[in-house]
């Protein structure tokens, strides 16, 4: 069995450490415990110094594999010296016959001769058939020394017979022994295991092993997140990570019987260029992994936000216009992960060909390898190979480069998967995608047909992207392939986000999203130009990573690409407008007061037509849905629907104060009718409690629930009451609070929710005509079981009641319960405050932007109240680590804030809070605000707060 072929004397002076061991043995010959302590100290010193040197060399040369080999070699020397010392000095087994000696072997990753700084050390101690009495005590002594050195040691003590027997039954053990490497002890014993394992386990079991390893890989990808474009990837286990490369090597070693990955070139499995790609990918991933372990001081495998910036710096990345150093580093990472995917595909193609040559029937072992070949109607260039599109001849692409697009189109219309050999040939033919092909009318027709397919366009586009065809055919798309945005909001790379957005659009059109998006599902069939909509969805983030605003830059890109796709001038203008305005509807819905007519008027002026409004709504839904899991919720859907309906009324000529009054009166009549089982006078009195915004924005079934809640509280004589309800579909929980109104009520409720660890996703805040507040706070669900979530919500409601009643003080509760989020500490968001009197006819609009943290909303609102500002409505939107809070305010007499000096003071106080500076307003946060004579928050009687966290 192979040992390290290279030594690294700069890491450890082996002779010097051996001499020190000899000195320890002679100095403590009769005292085992002092001997053990001295030995431990010597090894600890050598290990620390060796690893420090390995880290220093990694920083100097950036060689990831070399670093892993240095640490593995260091580990080998320590184990060898320890083995020799224990057998010779502790157990006096130096003269034991060869037949009774043990062998120490490395397995797992350590067996490959590479070891990450924080990785486990996996050892297999081989015993002879007839073991010596000292064997197991000696192994135990060695293990205790290794544990005391701080190593995490995975170990097994077995005979060769045990190894063979267990390998037959357990694929994990079989894989470990496949990588078994001799470290020290009996060479004969280790060699015998290698020979018997090869003859008795490996021979004639290749298909079984391959099937198991590929199934294991698929399951690993599922657990780690089945995309290589998650922005916090697992470098070891994730898709496109080191384990995928290891899987290729395991299969190579098992099936092709190679000792080194370089042998795959000799066998024709990989070309010389592809092998260089393999080496570069492995070296880069090892460099990243070693830096991660050194930086964190542990076996950290997830490349999380809080270490990405430091890893980028360690690897020597620098800022470029439009892309920060960390974003450039992560783009490189995802491109490497994509290369690993390409290599996997090429490898599987060669593997299938080899199996077909060796034993035609064996290809059934891997489920997708089938041999039936049929003609495909309408083409002579491609065939159906067991449900997968394959090439009819090797020169298909060279003869006609348009076939590089046509293959994907034919696969789409015939519902075919892709033969790995076909994709391998695509990868090797990318140079055929020239400027001439990009302008080819037929090629662009085929592409547009793929994009707007009524089947599953995302699947075909994804295959095109994985094969690098999409980025070559549309170079502007190629620039955003594997590009990540360094923030907590976007879960995927830009190209992955765009493909997912197309998928959402396709699902809406195919009627698969009616429950989640009823309005868009209703509007989609009536869209006049679906081609323009699909193109806009694909291109909406095409200009990310550029110095200028990506919406404006993206519109320029769209204006260039649309004529190339053979879109008409009218279609081009539609796409350009949609790309430029793709963030507008979301921002207006989430950060503006939708009950303020000027909000609707200003938005309608930008939209100008009902058709544009419909298309922008659908694009907005696709964009938010494709950001990542948990970003979309029912509250966002409600906001977008409200904005859509109000704007639709205005654009169709039906929006007026009179129409709003008529709609509010109709809503009041509906509520009174729904309360038919109440006495007439009581229900009429109740309906008069509510103002116009409440009646227009709260659903009737919610109004009925509120009525029962308020009636019950009044009957019980309760000044303060809370009610909770969970929503499975929207994944939110409602906490409704009935309380005497107070200018700082929002501060208290937000603070109590933050202290309870509840992530606010929205709020509906209304004031009744008798001076009470009826506030419904929406928080993210924490538990999937309704009973558990209801108990949690009740505890949050109880905390709100405790603070409002004065039983607990808000500053104390927040200080004791809130903690900063570790992940958000990796980011910086420059505090910004914008104060405008142009966005509303009645209110001054204050927009604050900064780094989100627990309790920020309560602190900001406390400062606004401290500055004698009345908050009419608040709109809290969080994009990952960044929060954008918008407040519609007046002074205490209901006027706008027009004084420049006062505006400057407001901005300064808010910036200080956003920056985390201590503000005296926090110490004066109110508690026990329930009073016999409440002070109302605003004269207009109703407010709406919107938040996403």
From Swiss-Prot:
Domain of life according to the entry: Bacteria
Catalytic activity: [protein-PII]-L-tyrosine + UTP = [protein-PII]-uridylyl-L-tyrosine + diphosphate; [protein-PII]-uridylyl-L-tyrosine + H2O = [protein-PII]-L-tyrosine + UMP + H(+)
Keywords: Hydrolase, Magnesium, Multifunctional enzyme, Nitrogen fixation, Nucleotidyltransferase, Repeat, Transferase
Cited SMART domains: HDc
Residue ranges, annotated region (Uridylyl-removing): 378-733
Role this protein plays: Modifies, by uridylylation and deuridylylation, the PII regulatory proteins (GlnB and homologs), in response to the nitrogen status of the cell that GlnD senses through the glutamine level. Under low glutamine levels, catalyzes the conversion of the PII proteins and UTP to PII-UMP and PPi, while under higher glutamine levels, GlnD hydrolyzes PII-UMP to PII and UMP (deuridylylation). Thus, controls uridylylation state and activity of the PII proteins, and plays an important role in the regulation of nitrogen fixation and metabolism.
Uridylyltransferase: region residues: 1-377
Similarity section: Belongs to the GlnD family.
EC assignment: 2.7.7.59, 3.1.4.-
Origin species: Sinorhizobium medicae (strain WSM419) (Ensifer medicae)
Record comment regarding domains: Has four distinct domains: an N-terminal nucleotidyltransferase (NT) domain responsible for UTase activity, a central HD domain that encodes UR activity, and two C-terminal ACT domains that seem to have a role in glutamine sensing.
ACT domain mapped to chain residues: 734-815, 845-926
Repeat listed as a keyword: yes
Protein's name in the database: Bifunctional uridylyltransferase/uridylyl-removing enzyme
PROSITE patterns in UniProt: ACT, HD
Domain HD intervals: 494-610
Cofactor annotation: Mg(2+)
Activity regulation, short description: Uridylyltransferase (UTase) activity is inhibited by glutamine, while glutamine activates uridylyl-removing (UR) activity.
Gene giving rise to this polypeptide: glnD
CDD domains noted in UniProt: ACT_ACR-UUR-like_2 (cd04899), ACT_UUR-like_1 (cd04900), HDc (cd00077), NT_GlnE_GlnD_like (cd05401)
Residue span of region Disordered: 925-949
One Pfam entry name: HD
InterPro entries tied to this protein: ACT-like_dom_sf (IPR045865), ACT_dom (IPR002912), HD/PDEase_dom (IPR003607), HD_domain (IPR006674), NT_sf (IPR043519), PII_UdlTrfase/GS_AdlTrfase (IPR013546), Polymerase_NTP_transf_dom (IPR002934), UTase/UR (IPR010043)
Any one biological process term the GO annotation gives: nitrogen fixation
């Amino acid at each position: 069995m192979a040992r390290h072929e290279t030594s690294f004397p700069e890491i450890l002076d082996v002779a010097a450490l051996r001499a020190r061991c000899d000195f320890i043995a002679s100095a403590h010959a009769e005292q085992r415990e002092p001997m053990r302590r001295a030995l431990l100290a010597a090894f600890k010193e050598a290990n620390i110094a060796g690893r420090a040197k390995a880290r220093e060399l990694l920083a100097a040369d950036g060689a990831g594999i070399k670093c892993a080999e240095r640490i593995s070699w260091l580990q080998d020397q320590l184990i060898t010296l320890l083995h020799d010392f224990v057998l010779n000095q502790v157990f006096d087994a130096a003269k034991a016959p060869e037949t009774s000696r043990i062998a120490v072997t490395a397995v797992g990753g350590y067996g490959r001769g590479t070891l990450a700084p924080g990785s486990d050390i996996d050892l297999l101690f081989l015993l002879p058939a007839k073991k010596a009495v000292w064997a197991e005590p000696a192994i135990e002594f060695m293990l205790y020394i290794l544990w005391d050195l701080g190593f995490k040691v995975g170990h097994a003590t077995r005979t060769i017979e045990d190894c063979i027997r267990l390998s037959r039954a357990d694929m994990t053990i079989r894989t470990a022994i496949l990588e078994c490497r001799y470290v020290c002890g009996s060479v004969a014993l280790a060699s015998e295991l290698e020979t018997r394992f090869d003859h008795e386990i490996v021979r004639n079991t290749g298909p079984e092993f391959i099937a198991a390893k590929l199934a294991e890989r698929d399951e690993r990808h599922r657990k780690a997140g089945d995309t290589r474009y998650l922005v916090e990837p697992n470098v070891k286990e994730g898709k496109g990570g080191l384990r995928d490369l290891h899987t290729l090597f395991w299969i190579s070693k098992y099936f092709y019987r190679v000792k080194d990955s370089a042998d795959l070139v000799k066998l024709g499995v990989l070309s010389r260029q592809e092998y260089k790609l393999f080496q570069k990918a492995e070296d880069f991933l090892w460099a990243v992994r070693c830096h991660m372990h050194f930086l964190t001081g542990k076996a950290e495998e997830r490349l999380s936000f809080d270490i990405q910036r430091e890893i980028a710096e360690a690897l020597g990345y620098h800022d470029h216009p439009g892309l920060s150093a960390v974003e450039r580093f992560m783009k490189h990472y995802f491109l490497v992960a994509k290369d690993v995917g390409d290599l996997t595909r090429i490898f599987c193609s060669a593997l299938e060909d080899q199996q077909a040559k060796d034993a035609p029937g064996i290809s059934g072992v891997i489920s997708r390898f089938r041999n039936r070949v049929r003609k495909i109607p309408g083409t002579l260039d491609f065939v159906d190979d067991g449900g997968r599109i394959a090439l009819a001849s090797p020169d298909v692409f060279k003869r006609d480069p348009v076939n590089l697009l046509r293959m994907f189109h034919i696969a789409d219309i015939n519902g075919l998967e892709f033969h790995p050999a076909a994709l391998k040939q695509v990868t090797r033919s990318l140079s055929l995608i020239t400027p001439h092909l990009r302008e080819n009318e037929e090629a662009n027709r085929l592409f547009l047909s793929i994009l707007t397919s009524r089947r599953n366009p995302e699947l075909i586009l994804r295959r095109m992207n994985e094969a690098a065809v999409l980025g070559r055919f549309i170079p502007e798309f190629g620039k955003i392939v594997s590009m990540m945005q360094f923030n907590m909001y976007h879960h995927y790379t830009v190209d992955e986000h765009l493909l997912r957005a197309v998928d959402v659009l396709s699902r809406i059109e195919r009627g698969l999203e009616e429950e989640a998006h009823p309005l868009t599902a209703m509007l989609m069939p009536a869209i006049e130009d679906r081609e323009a909509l699909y193109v806009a969805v694909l291109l909406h983030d095409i200009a990310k990573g550029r110095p200028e605003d990506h919406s404006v830059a993206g519109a320029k890109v769209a204006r260039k690409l649309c004529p190339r796709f053979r879109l008409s001038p009218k279609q081009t203008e539609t796409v350009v407008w949609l790309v430029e305005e793709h963030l507008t509807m979301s921002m207006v819905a989430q950060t503006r007061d939708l009950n303020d007519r000027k909000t609707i008027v200003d938005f309608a002026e930008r939209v100008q037509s009902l058709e544009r409004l419909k298309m922008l709504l659908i694009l907005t839904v696709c964009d938010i849905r494709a950001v990542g899991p948990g970003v979309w919720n029912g509250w966002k859907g409600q906001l977008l629907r409200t904005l859509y309906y109000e704007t639709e009324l205005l654009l169709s000529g039906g929006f007026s104060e009179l129409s709003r009054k008529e709609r509010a009166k109709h809503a009041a009549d509906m509520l009174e009718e729904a309360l038919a089982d109440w006495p007439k006078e009581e229900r009429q009195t109740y309906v008069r409690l509510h103002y116009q915004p409440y009646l227009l924005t709260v659903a009737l079934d919610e109004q009925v629930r509120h009525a029962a809640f308020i009636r019950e509280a009044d009957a019980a004589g309760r000044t303060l009451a809370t009610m909770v309800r969970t929503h499975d579909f929207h994944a939110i929980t409602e906490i409704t609070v009935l309380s005497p109104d107070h200018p700082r009520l929002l501060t208290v409720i937000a603070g109590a929710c933050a202290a309870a660890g509840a992530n606010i996703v929205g709020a509906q805040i209304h004031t009744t005509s008798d001076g009470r507040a009826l506030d419904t706070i929406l928080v993210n669900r924490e538990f999937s079981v309704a009973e558990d979530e209801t108990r949690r919500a009740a505890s949050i409601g109880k905390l709100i009641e405790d603070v409002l009643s004065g039983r607990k003080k808000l500053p104390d509760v927040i200080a004791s319960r809130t903690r900063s989020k570790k992940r958000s500490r990796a980011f910086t968001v420059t505090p910004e405050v914008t104060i405008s009197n142009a966005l509303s006819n009645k209110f001054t609009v204050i927009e604050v932007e900064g780094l989100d943290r627990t309790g920020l909303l309560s602190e900001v609102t406390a400062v606004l109240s401290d500055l004698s500002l009345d908050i009419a409505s608040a709109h809290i939107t969080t994009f990952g680590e960044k929060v954008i809070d918008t407040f519609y305010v007046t002074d205490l007499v209901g006027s706008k804030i027009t004084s420049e000096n006062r505006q400057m003071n407001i901005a300064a106080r808010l910036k200080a809070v956003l920056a985390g500076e201590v503000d005296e307003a926090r110490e004066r946060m109110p508690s026990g605000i329930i009073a016999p004579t409440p002070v109302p928050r605003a004269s207009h009687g109703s407010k709406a707060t919107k938040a996403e966290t």
